[in-house]
Amino acid sequence: MVSLICTLQSHRDDVNCVAFSGDLLATCSADKSICVYSSRDFSELPFSPLSGHGYGVHCCCFSACGQYLASCSTDATTMVWSMDTGEIEAVLEHPGRSPVRVCAFSPDSSHLVSGGSDGSIALWDFTSRTLRRTGVVNDTSIVACSFTPCGQMFITGSTYGDLRLWDLNMNHLHAEKNAHDLGVSCAQFAPKMMKGTDGCVQFRLASCGQDSLLKIWIVSLLPSAGIKMQLAHTLTGQSAPVLSCAYSPDGQMLVSGSVDKTVTVYQADEGVLLYTLHQHDRYVTACAFSPTAPLIATGSMDKSVNIWRMEEGSSAQGKSLPDEKAAFSNTEGRKACGHSRLMVSEWSEEEVLAWLREEGLEAVTDAFKSNNIDGEELLSLSKETLSSDLHIESLGLRSKVMKKIEELKMVPVYNGTPDEFLCPITREIMKDPVIAADGYSYEREAIEAWISTKNRTSPMTNLPLQTTLLTPNRTLKMAIFRWSTSQ
């Protein structure tokens, strides 16, 4: 059977990607951050969240050894982070400054590939952190990429609907046009090579798309040095666009997440549906298997990440699991699993104390407890009140507390905020919404900064803006004002 063991709720916006290493889990979000957890107890690491991207983070992936994490963003960069310190090791600027939608390491981590919204592909030499080759698929966005197990080729998937196979010299080896009607959303090779009946090397590839289908392909390297790609299975276990898919470490199982809010688990060889998991409240955008434990992580637009455990001998074909919340017991002295930082003003005194312990501020918990500090009082504190009323004598300690409080105040998005009130670039509530030439509304300051640095292309469509004229959206501004005053 499959059981839900933990729900992580650290992000303030849509979760876009989840990735496991041997002992870590990374999640990234439209809130511009990356969270990193221990995969043993799912406590958040001391240096998490990672903040460095200027816009939403679309994808993240670990190097083979787990020492590095790569993340890519609308800000046109792929960042490399040290998992020892949480520090930025390198910032790789995508050719043409296009938003970067996807990134992937080769199995030996010698190469890193990234795909852009303008159809550009960058192949990086990871050892030297230098650009090795570039390629392009015209009139589309690259939203999926994955290396073959041998590391000598990689696949890309686009919003146009095609799958394309490339070698490390960016030679185009094969194109499977119209692989998914309306566009590909994800593609991943199984981790192991196979041999065909004629002795040729074969790879299994899973892909999913806006056509609500999950497909399994056999990619064969023919003796004549040609490439043959055959459709082996078409899986129809979900009723809406399938946004993500991932193989288990042994290649025996396949998981997928969908707009219909479900997670499906298949036996990969025959495409047999094993489980349908119901838990998320919105689209399931990301999924991944742990390489070292029978665990699945799923991420969603409901801002949460669910951790599922696969029990040995799971074979209940087609079983649909009920929508039940599972408890998770936290151990003392670490960050509480799934502790929400939204609506701080509504925190109870106990939640404030839990937050202090999470932030390593145990030294002031007695003072806060004796003064009955709840969320509303927490936000009103100053250095002066910490000294005069709470009698915290250490200047350094007062400064640390105020720094953490200021970080809480910077959280811009609250539960229940209508999505149309959020700027597509910053994902923050708009104060001065304007309509750009692409028809979308943005925060004025954000779109002006975008236009000045992004060669006048639309943040939403990546097509050229016919004019830089911005029209105030007074109707939206009034709607935001009415909503905010009612909260």
Curated annotation (Swiss-Prot):
One GO process term, biological-process aspect: protein ubiquitination
Keyword terms: Repeat, WD repeat
Domain of life: Eukaryota
Molecular function as annotated in GO: ubiquitin-protein transferase activity
Keyword DNA-binding annotated: no
Classification via SMART domains: SAM, Ubox, WD40
Record flagged with keyword Repeat: yes
Location of the U-box domain: 416-487
Alphabetized PANTHER family for the sequence: WD REPEAT, SAM AND U-BOX DOMAIN-CONTAINING PROTEIN 1
Record-given protein name: WD repeat, SAM and U-box domain-containing protein 1
Species: Danio rerio
Gene name in the database record: wdsub1
